[in-house]
Amino acid sequence: MDLYGYVSCTPRIRHDVLDGLLNVYDPDELCSRDTPFRLYLTRYDCTPEGLRLFLTRGADVNGVRGSRTSPLCTVLSNKDLGNEAEALAKQLIDAGADVNAMAPDGRYPLLCLLENDRINTARFVRYMIDRGTSVYVRGTDGYGPVQTYIHSKNVVLDTLRELVRAGATVHDPDKTYGFNVLQCYMIAHVRSSNVQILRFLLRHGVDSSRGLHATVMFNTLERKISHGVFNRKVLDFIFTQISINEQNSLDFTPINYCVIHNDRRTFDYLLERGADPNVVNFLGNSCLDLAVLNGNKYMVHRLLRKTITPDAYTRALNVVNSNIYSIKSYGMSEFVKRHGTLYKALIRSFVKDSDREIFTYVHIYDYFREFVDECIRERDAMKADVLDAVSVFDTAFGLVARPRWKHVRILSKYVRGVYGDRVKKILRSLHKRRFKTDRLVRRIADLCGPDGLWTRLPVEVRYSVVDYLTDDEIHDLFVKIHA
């Protein structure tokens, strides 16, 4: 077996055999546009010792005319070598390999390095730049160093800094679609976007004007949502580029996609940021009916705490009405039973918020007749139960500025009703406030002493005075007095 056959076919290279063959055969002998030297550099078991043997026998470190590519580009592109490729590349450079020589296939050593995510570290890039490599080269795809690096799997801010500091441009567009570096990074790294890199690219002049940029940001956000990727800092960055209620060509908003893909974390984030759940897409859907269609109980409950428009209620109830109608026709009995709690929450909220009649949804009323009647009775009773011109309904559902302790007695009557969860929440807050109020009243009395003006005031007046303070004011005043 000759040197070419040994290097190309042997499962494991033995250095003693390789040394013997190199004494006989030319390491730069061209065969099918390849030399034994370049073939050796493509192997997974290429070592510095083996490379030293080739160099000792006179192998050309810049390759021979007619070969596929240069030895340095071969090593830098060989991902099978892992971190070993860095040591081999440095060995070639120390032996005289040209770091700026374009290989016969049009590639440059720096671009080969930046494509290889095993070795494209800031340290090695700095080494190449110190050895005189040019950062103004372009590959066969037209990309410069920054675009090439952005498309690799290992994008680190320190490496980008080294390239930009050496003069590499961040303004290279994508040759196929016209995306800039920032957009390419967002598209290529949906799961691993780093907000520091995004800010770095934006700070160095990447075009962020609307139009294509807004479309790319929105589409990237949709991909993140569909993959379940949540990064609050990256989302904050995206929403500096587009609106929280941005709509794509189909009139979908980001929160629409959260509901469609059941992405709870981004859904909660968008609601916190003030996303409008009532926006209607071109299919005529808003978030509430999409959540009902998906059977997502969590999202339905979260949405019902927001202000829902009558039309949004109508669409959601039409979904429920249709599902109940389909029980006998399509065997959906188990489906409706499984989502009964969700449907009841929707009905309960609709009866509370809307002046429209639930009876128009015939199948809903037939199926949930007792529950619907109970909701209506309790709603009407709460509206009729009035204390000091304020109804229990207004007190329980935040239609007055703040419930008072005097409302506890009449609120307690509705603890076991269909709106009991809301009433319990109000009562808990009132009891907590009463505890804070009582503590502050007693603390002021202790501070003033038995002969003070505060102590001589009637008890109900003392409590009325403190009751006008907000929770934060009560807390701050107590802390100051206690200190």
UniProtKB/Swiss-Prot annotation:
<dbReference type="InterPro" id="IPR002110">
    <property type="entry name" value="Ankyrin_rpt"/>
</dbReference>
<dbReference type="GO" id="GO:0044071">
    <property type="term" value="P:symbiont-mediated perturbation of host cell cycle progression"/>
</dbReference>
<protein>
    <recommendedName>
        <fullName>Ankyrin repeat domain-containing protein M-T5</fullName>
    </recommendedName>
</protein>
<dbReference type="InterPro" id="IPR036770">
    <property type="entry name" value="Ankyrin_rpt-contain_sf"/>
</dbReference>
<keyword id="KW-0677">Repeat</keyword>
<feature type="repeat" description="ANK 3">
    <location>
        <begin position="105"/>
        <end position="137"/>
    </location>
</feature>
<keyword id="KW-1123">Modulation of host E3 ubiquitin ligases by virus</keyword>
<keyword id="KW-1130">Modulation of host ubiquitin pathway by virus</keyword>
<dbReference type="GO" id="GO:0039648">
    <property type="term" value="P:symbiont-mediated perturbation of host ubiquitin-like protein modification"/>
</dbReference>
<feature type="repeat" description="ANK 2">
    <location>
        <begin position="67"/>
        <end position="101"/>
    </location>
</feature>
<feature type="region of interest" description="PRANC/F-box-like">
    <location>
        <begin position="390"/>
        <end position="478"/>
    </location>
</feature>
<keyword id="KW-0040">ANK repeat</keyword>
<keyword id="KW-0833">Ubl conjugation pathway</keyword>
<keyword id="KW-1077">G0/G1 host cell cycle checkpoint dysregulation by virus</keyword>
<comment type="function">
    <text>Substrate-specific adapter of SKP1-containing E3 ubiquitin-protein ligases which mediate the ubiquitination and subsequent proteasomal degradation of host target proteins including CDKN1B. Disappearance of host CDKN1B correlates with cell cycle progression through the G0/G1 checkpoint. Therefore, viruses in infected cells are protected from diverse innate host antiviral responses normally triggered by G0/G1 cell cycle arrest.</text>
</comment>
<feature type="repeat" description="ANK 1">
    <location>
        <begin position="32"/>
        <end position="63"/>
    </location>
</feature>
<dbReference type="Pfam" id="PF09372">
    <property type="entry name" value="PRANC"/>
</dbReference>
<keyword id="KW-1121">Modulation of host cell cycle by virus</keyword>
<keyword id="KW-0945">Host-virus interaction</keyword>
<dbReference type="GO" id="GO:0039646">
    <property type="term" value="P:symbiont-mediated perturbation of host cell cycle G0/G1 transition checkpoint"/>
</dbReference>
<dbReference type="InterPro" id="IPR018272">
    <property type="entry name" value="PRANC_domain"/>
</dbReference>
<dbReference type="GO" id="GO:0033668">
    <property type="term" value="P:symbiont-mediated suppression of host apoptosis"/>
</dbReference>
<feature type="repeat" description="ANK 5">
    <location>
        <begin position="250"/>
        <end position="279"/>
    </location>
</feature>
<dbReference type="Pfam" id="PF00023">
    <property type="entry name" value="Ank"/>
</dbReference>
<feature type="repeat" description="ANK 4">
    <location>
        <begin position="177"/>
        <end position="210"/>
    </location>
</feature>
<feature type="repeat" description="ANK 6">
    <location>
        <begin position="283"/>
        <end position="312"/>
    </location>
</feature>
<comment type="subunit">
    <text>Interacts (via PRANC/F-box-like domain) with the SKP1 component of the host SCF ubiquitin ligase complex. Interacts (via N-terminus) with host AKT1.</text>
</comment>
